[in-house]
Amino acid sequence: MKLILTSLLATIVAAASLAAVAKSASTAQTVRVIESSYSIRLSAKPKPGTVKFLVRNASDDGHDFWLRGGGRTWKTRVMGETGTASLTAVLKRGVKYTYWCAVGSHRSKGMSGSFVAR
């Protein structure tokens, strides 16, 4: 009997964990990122939780997208002219995140920014 109850409890806990993961994935915020000549624009201020960044290169120069904060760093591949990429990050409330393009001297020419997840 004890083995059956333990097995049942383990099944319930596993199902609850899977439901939480599925809910988290379905409620991910989407932020569109437009990279052009020495400029990066975010469509919205990212909030805490799972955020999917959809990045589009709107210029004829190569660009990538880096995001750092909370002890983590995420990056996309370099996109060619009119290329797209995406990355998904889990942002922590109250943490400052910085983002930039690391291609050549793009960051020092203004392709950077920051936000606090609130």
Predicted regions and their residues:
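Bacterial N-terminal signal peptides
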Residues: 6-17
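Extracellular/periplasmic metallocenter environments
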Residues: 23-34, 80-118
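N-terminal edge beta-strand
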Residues: 26-50
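Short, solvent-exposed loop/turn positions at domain surfaces
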Residues: 39-40, 73, 85
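Beta-strand cores of secreted/periplasmic/IMS beta-sandwich domains, seen most often
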Residues: 43-61, 85-101
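Short, surface-exposed beta-strand/strand-loop-strand elements in extracellular ectodomains
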Residues: 64-70
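Surface-exposed loop/edge segments in extracytoplasmic proteins
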Residues: 71-78
